[in-house]
Amino acid sequence: MSTLSPIYSRCATQGNSCPVSTIPEAMAYADPNGTGTIYYRNSEANKAFTCNNASFGNQTNSTAYQCYNGNLPTDFRTAGSSFYENGIPKGWTKCSDENETCDPKVNSDVDILFGADGSYVYSSAKSVPCNINIFGDPKQGVKKACYWRSPLIPINHTPSTPVTPTTPSGTQTTGHKWWVYLLLFGIPLLILIFLIIFFIAKK
């Protein structure tokens, strides 16, 4: 059973549309638990993505599926001629031919591309069936394959917030309290003692 990668977040229930994005996004189609057979597509910029079976190849499922979106890797999303060599993504490793399973066996979600000749659909997964049923057909009429790489940005990576060193407040706070106590109680007490001594001496 496949499990949806945490790069994806639910964007629409079946029959609705995911919000319009100004850039293409990674789309996934899965059950409400993000499990079972998962289908992948790339969305188009500035165009609503309809969440239904037709958008993913007229799939028929026993449960109502939902749509999930995530970020496409920037270098893939903005890919120019330098991203490919003979239509194959540079620096990516072939993991399967069409109609086989891409399984890099690294026990973590990786970047996977399915397609040929510079036309690819993206997924983030541990493994995935490498076929047009799962990815659609990004390049009709030619034999396709799957390629993988480790994500450039670790999945679930949250940039750490710099912590500004602080001086322990104990001494400083204690010092402030000492002066406060002196002003509130010490000086009046000294005045009271002085007055008592003055009246005793006067008698």
From Swiss-Prot:
| Cellular compartment(s) | Virion; Host membrane
Mostly located where?
A: virion
This entry carries the following GO cellular component terms, namely: host cell membrane; membrane; virion component
Q: Which stretches are transmembrane?
A: 180-200
UniProt keyword terms in alphabetical order: Host membrane, Membrane, Transmembrane, Transmembrane helix, Virion
tRNA-binding as a keyword? Answer: no
Q: How does it sit in the membrane?
A: Single-pass membrane protein
Q: What superkingdom heads the lineage?
A: Viruses
Name by which UniProt lists this protein? Uncharacterized protein L701
| Organism this protein belongs to | Acanthamoeba polyphaga mimivirus
